[in-house]
Amino acid sequence: MISKWAKRFFQMAELVGSWSKDPSTQVGAVITKHNRIVSVGFNGYPHGVSDSADTDEREIKYLKTLHAEENAILFAKRDLEGCDIWVTHFPCPNCAAKIIQTGISKVYCPEQTEDFLSRWGEKIQVSQDMFSQAGVEVTWLPLDILK
């Protein structure tokens, strides 16, 4: 059974993700320690860079976008050793590297849909391998009890 804290932190990650101006993918991340929120982040352009959803082609948008995990790590401005991160989508390899490097010890993520796995399965496997090698615990949260 999922704890009330797990449900709350995942719901918060979803809420924070909804702040993204990206019309196709909204990702949220919440960093916690001992059931206290340390930082939050969502995917989007860096501060001061025009982020109108229709101004850039997809490839240019990808180059400019900070991922939710990156933003949460940057906004924290503190040591994240031993923290947990709650994400709406499984971290890409670049974000996995940053999570590992900061000392975050646990990643909580909802089970991924078949559609998501069909598009990102290879990158998910790379990230999972990185987390496993670095000793970062990954917990998959069942979708049906998160809502």
UniProtKB/Swiss-Prot annotation:
GO terms for molecular function: dCMP deaminase activity; zinc ion binding. GO terms for biological process: cytidine deamination; pyrimidine nucleotide metabolic process. GO terms for cellular component: cytoplasm. Its cofactor is Zn(2+). Keywords: Hydrolase, Metal-binding, Zinc. The keyword Zinc applies. The keyword Thylakoid does not apply. The active site is at 69 (proton donor). It is an enzyme of class 3 (hydrolase). Zn(2+) binds at residues 67, 92, 95. Coiled coil: none annotated. It comes from the Bacteria. Its EC number is 3.5.-.-. Residues 4-120 form the CMP/dCMP-type deaminase domain. Belongs to the cytidine and deoxycytidylate deaminase family. This is Uncharacterized deaminase in luxG 3'region.
